[in-house]
């Protein structure tokens, strides 16, 4: 099973690495992901505006979609925000779920890593979503960090450079 997953990850990485950057309406992507989730009954909102950005579209979609899926899986709701700056675009996926302890936040980016407790096996998944999300953010020249949400929960912060 692990060898099959490794082969799948290698294939996906090769496909995304060869993808050519293009000008993308990131705001439309975020709004579309929110609308799709809302159509399935999810409590998700989007706020903020941004100008288009040169990115690999599949990589960005994979990154943001994995983060939104995690927020909805573990918290049952999410807020996605866009913050546009001259030098970078910041995308936040904010939830008020159980959160992740500060000392475990980097570990969740390791393949197949699963937390004990509320963010765990009951929710499904195999522990690859955060790995894929960070790898995609880094391929886009950006970074993905996890922070505590004020009042409780988790905020995933994607910072993408404007080139």
Give the residues covered by each predicted segment:
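Short alpha-helical Gxxx[C/S/T] motif in the catalytic ATP-binding
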Residues: 124, 129, 133
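Conserved polar catalytic motif of the HATPase_c/GHKL fold
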Residues: 65-66, 70
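Acidic ATP/Mg2+-coordinating residue in the GHKL
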Residues: 95
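Short beta-strand/loop element within the Bergerat-fold HATPase_c
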Residues: 77-87
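Short conserved segment of the HATPase_c
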Residues: 100-113
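Conserved DHp (HisKA) dimerization/phosphotransfer helix of two-component histidine kinases, i.e.
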Residues: 1-40
């Amino acid at each position: 099973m692990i060898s099959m997953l490794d082969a799948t990850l290698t294939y996906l990485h090769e496909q995304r690495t060869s993808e050519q950057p293009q000008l993308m309406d990131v705001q439309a992507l975020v709004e579309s992901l929110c609308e799709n989730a809302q159509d399935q009954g999810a409590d998700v909102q989007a706020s903020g505006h941004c100008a288009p950005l040169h990115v690999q579209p599949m990589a960005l979609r994979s990154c943001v979609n994995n983060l939104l899926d995690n927020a909805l899986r573990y918290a049952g709701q999410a807020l996605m925000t866009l913050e546009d700056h001259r030098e970078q675009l910041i995308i936040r996926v904010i939830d008020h779920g159980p959160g992740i302890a500060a000392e475990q936040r980097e570990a969740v980016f390791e393949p197949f890593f699963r937390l004990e407790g509320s963010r765990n096996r009951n929710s499904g998944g195999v522990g690859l979503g955060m790995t894929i999300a960070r790898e995609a953010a880094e391929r886009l020249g950006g970074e993905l960090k996890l922070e505590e949400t004020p009042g409780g929960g988790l905020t995933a912060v994607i910072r993408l450079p404007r080139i």
